[in-house]
């Protein structure tokens, strides 16, 4: 089962309020988003309001488990709000990887190091990271065997992999839909079990949920499909 799951929309609102109360909210204001639409800026700003729950959940876990001096790698970091959040919180050894070479943050290059690449052949030294994060990216072009093999390679023993993704307990047929030029999957219960198996075969163990979840109806509607978000956390043994 997942480590955590978004069960109602209020959790998104509450997560954003928490980030704002800690001065850790970096998404554009409504006015900035309006201006971007006016000038037809397809790149958009940092982050996504709908990902507030994922981002805040990940930040809280990192804040509780990872030292400020540890190396943290964010997968699919282009426009990621997590990177500036962690930097503002005091983390100074941040790394990011993305296929988009235009990824830029207003952060000292000694404190954030970006490399162009994909998740399945990362230009990252083995056993160099204490934490790898992936906010809503693994469902695009997903290759479970390749992903967990490579994440396990770059993680130090005891390090964590935190992944949020699109989820619904039963299978949703997305009819070969693609986003960002990549295949897309809404993970279901069977796919999560397979994910756990990929992790186990690469010396990674899932952090179990601390509670049961009352998921009665979808929270997210996107591209004609109804689902929610979930998070799985694994620790390298």
Summary of predicted features, one role per range:
Residues 77-121:
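Class I SAM-dependent methyltransferase SAM/SAH-binding core
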Residues 174-206:
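Conserved Class I S-adenosyl-L-methionine
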Residues 68-78:
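Conserved class I S-adenosyl-L-methionine
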Residues 21-22, 33-65:
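Class I SAM-dependent methyltransferase Rossmann-like catalytic core
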